[in-house]
């Protein structure tokens, strides 16, 4: 096969791919149901993957198509948009498998004709130019491809596809090893890295040559194979023979037919003719025997035509194979099928029904028929076929006879005229179905208040096991290891809050601790004030009202006494003098503004607008506005008489119209006739005669002046095109007494009303629209009501907790009783004032811990409001399970905030149903409490009156309008320079999108873009009927209107969109396509190395005044590198200048201060050493501060060589107190990135990503807000949260994580409210197809996931039985069980959840966690504490109870408390198999592993652990199978009998008149809980007990999958049955204590590796603490071993982190 060099290259290419496999990330490949995830599936990889499924048997076409459709439906149901590509060259790989050639062709036909999937078959190969162009035009997120083919040759083809995709910067997703659930599709992603791209580029010539060599070799194989079967007939000859056969049939069946009949008769006739012509050898079947086989084939098709799937699923399973002599004919027949199917496209006009192209061959049915006629038909009486089957069979055979002209094929009966058996005679021919393995179907009787209320209605209809059933008595005699007898296994453990160490003792009265806490609070307030310039509000509790003045009349008498009169007069004089001074200052300021406008209009206008912002008097404002208008008018006349004769500067006209807009809209009551006349004059000079006449009809114009001063643009077009972002918005003018700082919009007022009425609300509003204000108003309300009420703010990520906490500390201050604080925080890493604060900032995971803790209910009852920010994370992969539970378990009002939800109505209705439940529950509990109170038995904590005042209404508050418009720009690189092209949002759309979905709700246009759309429409359709009506000057809302408002422009935009949609509806699709094409920018011009152009991009943005800007990237390493490259760019362009005296004066002043500090320190050192130490520290920080200022070189670095705001820097340096730099510099002094961040900050640059310390991130955030940094490179860490707005957002790196949701979140940062009227979004190095998809895609819909797990059920039962308030606990548990989003208005889903709940209880009883009353038993607390690691937590407890850890953990010597390294390594091995599971794709095991110390693949569990795990899995699997058997009784079997994607039904009336059918289809037992499609391959209910097949055979409509069973196999098989090894990163780290080697050998990135190791260390610590609490014997070997392991692992990790930090600093 080609040269030796090519063979070597094939191995090199294969090894490269294998080496990349440990680095493959296993995650959800579709980012949370986002439509922008367009990708490509390689059709042959899809075929090979489904062929390799363990439950599938070759020859069962219908089962195969079912598997294909299941795979595709899982992708589509999760929002996937894809194209399937079948390369022509890929056909060569199947010439040794002709049965797959016909199957592949049938698959293509099925997908093209029976589904809406886009199928591409025109590409010759993956190296063709057409394919390369396709990738460039569509730029898929990834390509799904198989890493292994059916042969080495096919594997090489897949390898070429993978390498080429990497070279085109397209990621690869492996088609095998995938899993899916109700929300997500998980698979392995192999990213296109620089290394892979380099390999592809450097070996481009070799790749082309090797590929051609491979295809040439495959072509040679094709010639040999055809010669074997058809001798001298070539490929084209066979294609012609197939065409002629079809042509003859078309004349016979001119009215049409279906594909099953057509293929049957044509393939049989063509096979017979070819066999007769070329193959009549002694070792093959005779011609008469071949005729018999074709008769059986025709009868089989007749069966397929008449038998519904329900009957065929009961077929006997024939295990014997065809005799070897029949191989030649069988392959020839398959070749003929392929040639026939390949010719079908030629007969396009023939009425051919392709619905059942998926059911062309059923080998099991054929074998059944053959077996009967060979072994069973000799017995009397013979079984009849039935009239309909017999008739169809005879028709088929008669057509075969007609098509075969060369010889007589005989009559249709008898079917067998020869004696040779086609099936081999074997001992066991028919597969026997044994149900002995299947468990007893039934539930152990249980009872409790929760169980009875939730599933009581269902229990009466379910099978209940009797007490004498062998399963029941065996449950309660489980042996526990003797070593555990002294353990308090039933003890409730402390929760995470108890174990997370606070930095200090918050209750301590130690002065040093109090001083430290005061410093923390001061810094938090400083941090908050830095993020937002809002003054602190003092909160006074409403119950503590100020005392009334008791002086009464005496006070008035005192005021009238002489001394008071004298004081009053003096004050009056003082006020008069002060007013005079202010008036004089005001006059001076106005004079300076007027002079400035004369000298520089635009500079003067900026000062004027600053003055207007600070001025409170309307009359003064009016006068200033008139002053500005007069100045603009004079400047316009002067300009037009001078430079304007050549080209007019319309910015002056824009400023003039801005003043006119403001005067007419804001001061109508002050305007008089003379003002109207002057404004009319201004309009006249601009050429707006109609507008001028509407103000002053008496105005006489001068035609000469008109031509000289006119802008020659209509007033409406001028306002839209040049004043779009200045247009006045319709805002309320009446102030709300509840809001001091601004006038709230109508929707904001509605929010305030919601909070005032104690209602709940779902708030959907764009970023920076002001929805966060409602959160702070809610906090203030709770703070004012009492000192005990709590408001909980749930942030989506822990990185935001510090930000929000700081803003709360800055906004509010309140005097509280001792032991209480205003604000607290709780994350898994940090807790501070959690239970004694009034405002708790936390994350979903930690809030869930508090809500489900039985002994935290008293604190939970204090919660008055919960605020959920960015709730669209309810649908995200990480943290989604917490959001849904929190929303249903809280009983207080809530605010749900989000900027991006596509289905807010559904979310609101669901939450309203939850609130209705709580309304009823609270009423019942209140009544019960009242009755119990009379008997002094009330334990209910709801006696607090605050719950009585809450409303149970849930409002939906929508705001669809951003305050600032966003303009999108595409960055291109041409001639080593960066250029910017405006991107019109409509250019992202297609006619198909508009026709199917309309315009995306958040795809809005700026007024300028609306004008551009109108002009393009008018240009494309010159005779457009509505062109005049929609012309800006004639549009009804614009005509003769002086002040066009933002709302008018929005309505104009809506009219244009509606009109464009109507064009499509009225058949003008081509015109719409031209419009969209004309709006699209030209193709992007890019450089080969866009990274090097990044600094130039930043510089160009600075020159255009588009800073501050956030540059979003998606790799932590790149974030720092790009920031560094920008700094280097500035250093190279730096020009030296001489320092000014002023700068030196600052340094001299600082030196004087330092000298004073030194002298003071000498005096104090002897008297007070501690105070001296404090001064020394201050001196060091001050010196560092001076050094920073000197390095800034304010006067040496020109404004062109720093991105900082020079004015902000000047202010910072001249400030004597509270310097920002002086506060933040010491905090990053010893951090890992501190030195680098300070160096970058001196140039106004920073970076921000998740791996930074929180102090480093705060450093960047504070300086960015202050203007000291104006260029920040960042990952998505700055996409969420608050207080980081900027003028521009730049997407500077593509990634699979750049989807529609993240795009909206990140782009929302652009445009600072109150500072920028327009936000800018730039795309740099992002492919144009990707940009279009981002803009055109809808935001994700929130969908419910499967809400229950075994451990969650255990935690709920713990809460119900151990809760401080039983009634409250019960109500919360039932709310969780009854109100999942998945089951909302879905009765069938609720039934499944109830059954799963029962299954969970049964398993918990059998594993001895619960008793029959639902109360917790042994180790329930331990299992529930490790709830985040199911099923590993259950397995761990199982091992512990069996005594396996006690057997393993033997001290080094008797009496010792230390354990050997060997014991520790074995313990790590066991725990890594439980808590450090990261699988590697199965194909990796073929790699040539040659590592000295580090092994990539984790070793198996020790034998005793492995045996125990097998027993555990078998027990769980049987219980789960029992659950599936019961659940299957209520599924919708009609849906189970249709293909899931094409919805083609295989239902119908069962054939009852055929004795043969009844005989063959007699196996109904054991096929209850599996899909009827999989029964065709001989699968039974027993396959539910096999881990490699359970997900493949389960009923799709049952609503669960095998992932819901808490199984943990020592190995994992992929879909093709190959074993997937575990990554040994944990054990290798423990052994070698080296992260670098792990990074290189184990294939995990450093950041990911560090995170996983930290999680593992946290788990060990949690287990160690738990065991210590459960065991009183502190010398217990297991307790000691885990303690030793926890300490050593933590020390190794700390040592490694310190080493990494030191290396970074060096």
From Swiss-Prot:
It catalyses: ATP + H2O = ADP + phosphate + H(+). It comes from Homo sapiens. The gene is DDX60L. Residues 752-919 form the Helicase ATP-binding domain. The lineage of its organism: Eukaryota, Metazoa, Chordata, Craniata, Vertebrata. Residues 551-564 have a biased composition (Polar residues). A motif (DEAH box) lies at residues 869-872. One of its GO terms (biological process) is defense response to virus. Belongs to the helicase family. SMART domains: DEXDc, HELICc. ATP binds at residues 765-772. Keywords: ATP-binding, Helicase, Hydrolase, Nucleotide-binding, RNA-binding. Residues 1205-1354 form the Helicase C-terminal domain. Pfam families: DEAD (PF00270), Helicase_C (PF00271), PIN-like_DDX60 (PF23002). Its EC number is 3.6.4.13. Residues 545-580 are annotated as: Disordered. This is Probable ATP-dependent RNA helicase DDX60-like. GO terms for molecular function: ATP binding; ATP hydrolysis activity; double-stranded RNA binding; RNA helicase activity; single-stranded RNA binding. Residues 565-574 have a biased composition (Basic residues). One of its GO terms (cellular component) is cytoplasm. It comes from the Eukaryota.
């Amino acid at each position: 096969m080609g040269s030796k060099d090519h063979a070597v290259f094939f191995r090199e290419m294969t090894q490269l791919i294998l080496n990349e496999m440990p680095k493959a990330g296993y995650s959800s490949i579709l980012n949370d149901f986002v439509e922008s995830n367009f990708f490509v599936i390689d059709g042959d990889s899809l075929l090979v993957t489904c062929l390799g499924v363990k439950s599938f048997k070759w020859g069962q076409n219908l089962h195969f198509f079912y598997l294909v459709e299941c795979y595709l439906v899982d992708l589509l149901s999760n929002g996937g948009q894809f194209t399937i590509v079948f390369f022509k060259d890929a056909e060569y790989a199947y010439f040794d498998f002709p049965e797959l050639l016909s199957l592949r062709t049938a698959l293509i036909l099925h997908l093209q004709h029976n589904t809406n999937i886009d199928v591409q078959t025109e590409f010759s190969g993956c190296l063709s130019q057409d394919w390369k162009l396709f990738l460039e035009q569509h730029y898929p997120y990834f390509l799904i491809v198989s890493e292994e083919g059916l042969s080495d040759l096919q594997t090489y083809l897949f390898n070429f596809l993978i390498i080429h995709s990497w070279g085109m910067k397209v990621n690869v997703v492996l088609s095998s090893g995938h899993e899916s659930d109700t929300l997500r599709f998980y698979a392995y992603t192999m990213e296109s890295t620089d290394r892979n791209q380099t390999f592809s580029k450097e070996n481009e010539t070799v790749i082309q040559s090797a590929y051609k060599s491979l295809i040439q070799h495959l072509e040679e194989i094709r010639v040999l194979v055809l010669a074997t079967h058809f001798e001298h007939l070539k490929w084209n000859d066979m294609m012609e023979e197939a065409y002629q056969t079809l042509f003859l049939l078309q004349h016979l069946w001119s009215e049409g037919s279906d594909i099953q009949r057509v293929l049957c008769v044509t393939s049989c006739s063509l096979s017979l003719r070819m066999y007769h012509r070329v193959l009549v050898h002694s070792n093959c079947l005779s011609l008469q025997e071949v005729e018999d086989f074709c008769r059986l084939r025709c009868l089989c098709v007749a069966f397929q035509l008449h038998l519904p799937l329900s009957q065929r699923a009961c077929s006997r399973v024939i295990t014997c194979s065809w005799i070897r002599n029949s191989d030649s004919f069988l392959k020839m027949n398959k070749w003929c099928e392929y040639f026939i199917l390949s010719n079908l496209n030629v007969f396009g006009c023939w009425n051919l029904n392709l619905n059942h192209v998926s059911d062309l061959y059923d080998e099991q049915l054929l074998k059944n028929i053959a077996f009967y006629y060979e072994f069973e038909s000799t017995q009397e009486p013979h079984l009849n076929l039935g009239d309909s089957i017999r008739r169809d069979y005879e028709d088929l055979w008669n057509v075969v006879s007609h098509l075969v002209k060369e010889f007589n094929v005989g009559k249709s009966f008898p079917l067998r005229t020869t004696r040779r058996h086609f099936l081999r005679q074997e001992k066991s021919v028919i597969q026997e179905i044994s149900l002995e393995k299947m468990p007893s179907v039934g539930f152990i009787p249980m009872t409790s208040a929760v169980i009875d209320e939730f599933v009581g209605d269902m229990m009466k209809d379910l099978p209940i096991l009797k007490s004498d059933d062998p399963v029941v008595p065996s449950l309660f005699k489980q042996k526990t290891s003797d070593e555990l007898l002294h353990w308090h296994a039933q003890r409730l453990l402390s929760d995470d809050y108890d174990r997370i160490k606070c930095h200090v003792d918050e209750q301590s009265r130690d002065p040093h601790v109090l001083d430290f806490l005061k410093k923390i609070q001061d810094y938090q307030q400083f941090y908050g004030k830095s993020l937002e310039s809002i003054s602190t509000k003092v909160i006074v509790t409403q119950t503590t009202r100020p005392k009334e003045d008791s002086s009464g009349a005496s006070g008035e008498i005192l005021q009238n006494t002489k001394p008071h009169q004298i004081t009053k007069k003096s004050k009056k004089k003082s006020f008069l003098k002060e007013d005079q001074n202010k008036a004089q200052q005001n006059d001076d300021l106005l004079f300076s503004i007027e002079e400035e406008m004369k000298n520089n209009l635009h500079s003067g206008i900026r000062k004027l607008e600053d003055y207007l912002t600070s001025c409170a008097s309307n009359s003064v404002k009016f006068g200033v506005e008139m002053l500005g208008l007069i100045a603009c008018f004079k400047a316009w006349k002067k300009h037009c008489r001078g430079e304007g004769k050549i080209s007019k500067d319309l910015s002056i006209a824009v400023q003039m119209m801005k003043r006119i807009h403001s005067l007419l809209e804001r001061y109508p009551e002050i305007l008089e006739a003379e003002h109207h006349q002057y404004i009319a004059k201004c309009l006249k000079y601009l050429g707006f005669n109609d507008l001028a006449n509407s103000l002053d009809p008496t105005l006489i114009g001068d035609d000469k002046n008109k031509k000289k001063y006119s802008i020659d643009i209509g007033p409406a077009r001028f306002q839209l095109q040049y004043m779009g972002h200045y247009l006045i918005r319709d805002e309320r003018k009446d102030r709300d007494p509840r809001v001091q700082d601004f006038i709230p919009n109508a929707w904001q007022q509605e929010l305030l009303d919601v909070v005032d009425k104690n209602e709940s609300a779902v708030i959907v509003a764009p970023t920076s629209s002001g929805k966060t204000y409602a959160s702070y108003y809610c906090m203030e309300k709770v703070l004012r009501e009492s000192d005990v009420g709590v408001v909980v703010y749930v942030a989506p990520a822990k990185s935001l907790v510090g930000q929000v906490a700081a803003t709360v500390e800055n906004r509010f201050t309140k005097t509280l009783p001792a032991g209480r604080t205003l604000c607290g925080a709780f994350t898994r890493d940090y807790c501070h004032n959690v239970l004694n604060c009034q405002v708790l900032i936390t994350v979903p995971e930690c809030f869930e811990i508090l809500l489900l803790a039985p002994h935290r209910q008293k604190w939970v009852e204090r919660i008055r409001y919960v605020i959920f920010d960015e709730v669209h994370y309810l649908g995200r992969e990480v943290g989604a399970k917490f959001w849904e539970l929190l929303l249903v378990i809280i009983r207080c009002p809530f605010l749900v905030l989000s900027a991006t939800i596509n289905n807010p109505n559904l979310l609101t209705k669901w939450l309203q149903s939850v609130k209705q439940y709580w309304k009823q529950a609270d009423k019942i509990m209140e009544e019960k409490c009242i009755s119990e109170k009379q008997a002094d038995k009330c334990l209910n904590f709801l006696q607090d009156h605050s719950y009585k005042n809450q409303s149970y209404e849930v409002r939906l508050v929508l705001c669809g309008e951003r305050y600032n418009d966003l303009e999108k720009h595409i960055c291109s690189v041409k001639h080593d320079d960066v250029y910017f092209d405006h991107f019109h949002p409509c250019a992202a759309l297609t006619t198909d999108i508009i026709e199917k979905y309309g315009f995306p709700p958040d795809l809005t246009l700026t007024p300028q873009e609306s004008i551009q759309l109108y002009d393009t429409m008018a240009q494309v359709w010159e005779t457009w009927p509505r062109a005049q009506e929609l012309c800006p000057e004639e549009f009804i809302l614009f005509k003769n209107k002086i002040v066009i408002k933002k709302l008018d422009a929005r309505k104009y935009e809506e009219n244009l969109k509606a009109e464009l949609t109507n064009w499509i509806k009225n058949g003008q699709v081509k015109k719409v396509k031209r419009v969209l094409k004309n709006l699209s920018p030209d193709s992007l011009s890019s450089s080969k190395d866009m990274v090097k152009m990044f600094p130039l991009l930043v510089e160009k943005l600075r020159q255009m005044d588009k800073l501050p800007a956030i540059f979003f990237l998606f790799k932590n390493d790149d974030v720092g590198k790009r920031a560094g490259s920008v700094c280097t760019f500035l250093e190279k362009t730096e020009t030296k200048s001489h320092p000014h005296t002023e700068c030196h004066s600052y340094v001299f002043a600082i030196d004087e201060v330092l000298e004073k500090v030194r002298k003071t320190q000498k005096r104090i050192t002897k008297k007070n050493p501690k105070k001296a130490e404090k001064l020394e520290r201050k001196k060091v920080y001050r010196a560092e501060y001076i050094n920073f200022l000197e390095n800034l070189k304010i006067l040496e670095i020109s404004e062109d060589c720093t991105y900082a705001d020079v004015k902000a820097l000047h202010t910072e340096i001249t400030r004597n107190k509270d310097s920002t730099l002086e506060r933040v510099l010491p905090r990053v002094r010893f951090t890992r990135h501190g030195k680098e961040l300070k160096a970058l900050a001196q140039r106004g640059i920073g970076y921000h990503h998740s791996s930074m310390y929180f102090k480093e991130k705060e450093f960047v955030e504070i300086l960015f807000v202050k203007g000291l940094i104006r260029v920040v490179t960042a990952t998505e860490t700055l996409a969420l949260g608050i207080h980081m707005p900027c003028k521009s957002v730049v997407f500077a790196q593509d990634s699979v994580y750049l989807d529609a949701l993240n795009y909206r979140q990140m782009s929302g940062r652009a445009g600072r409210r109150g500072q920028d009227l327009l936000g800018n979004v730039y795309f740099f190095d992002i492919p144009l197809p990707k940009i279009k998809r981002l803009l055109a895609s809808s935001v994700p819909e929130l969908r419910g996931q499967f809400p229950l797990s075994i451990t969650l059920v255990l935690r709920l039962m713990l809460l119900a039985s151990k809760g401080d308030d039983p009634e409250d606990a019960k109500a919360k548990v039932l709310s969780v069980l009854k109100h999942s989003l998945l089951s909302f208005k879905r009765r069938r889903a609720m039934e499944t959840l109830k059954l799963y709940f029962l299954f969970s209880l049964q398993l918990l009883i059998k594993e001895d966690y619960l008793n029959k009353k639902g109360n917790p038993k042994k180790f329930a607390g331990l299992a529930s504490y490790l709830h985040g690691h199911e099923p590993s937590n259950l397995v761990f407890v199982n091992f512990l109870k069996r005594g396996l850890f006690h057997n393993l953990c033997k001290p080094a010597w008797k009496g010792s408390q230390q354990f050997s390294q060997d014991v520790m390594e074995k313990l790590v091995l066991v725990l890594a198999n439980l808590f450090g599971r990261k699988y590697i794709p199965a194909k990796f095991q073929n790699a040539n592993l040659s590592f000295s110390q580090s092994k990539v693949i984790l070793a198996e569990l020790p034998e005793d652990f492995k045996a125990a795990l097998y027993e555990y899995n078998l027990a769980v699997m049987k219980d789960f199978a029992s659950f599936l058997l019961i659940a299957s009784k209520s599924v919708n079997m009609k849906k189970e009998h249709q293909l899931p994607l094409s919805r083609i039904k295989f239902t119908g009336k069962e054939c009852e008149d055929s004795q043969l059918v009844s005989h063959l289809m007699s196996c109904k037992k054991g096929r209850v809980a599996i899909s009827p499609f999989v029964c065709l391959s001989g699968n039974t209910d027993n396959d539910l007990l096999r881990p490699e097949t359970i997900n493949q055979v389960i009923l799709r409509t049952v609503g669960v999958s095998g992932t819901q069973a808490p199984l943990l196999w020592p190995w994992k098989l992929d879909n093709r049955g190959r074993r997937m090894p575990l990554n040994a990163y944990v054990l290798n780290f423990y052994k070698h204590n080296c992260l670098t080697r792990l990074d290189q050998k184990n294939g995990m990135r450093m950041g990911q590796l560090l995170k996983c190791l930290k999680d593992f260390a946290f788990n060990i610590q949690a287990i160690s603490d738990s065991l210590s609490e459960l065991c009183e014997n502190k010398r217990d070997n297991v307790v000691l071993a885990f303690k030793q392991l926890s300490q050593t692992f933590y020390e190794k990790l700390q040592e490694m982190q310190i080493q990494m930090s030191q290396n970074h600093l060096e």
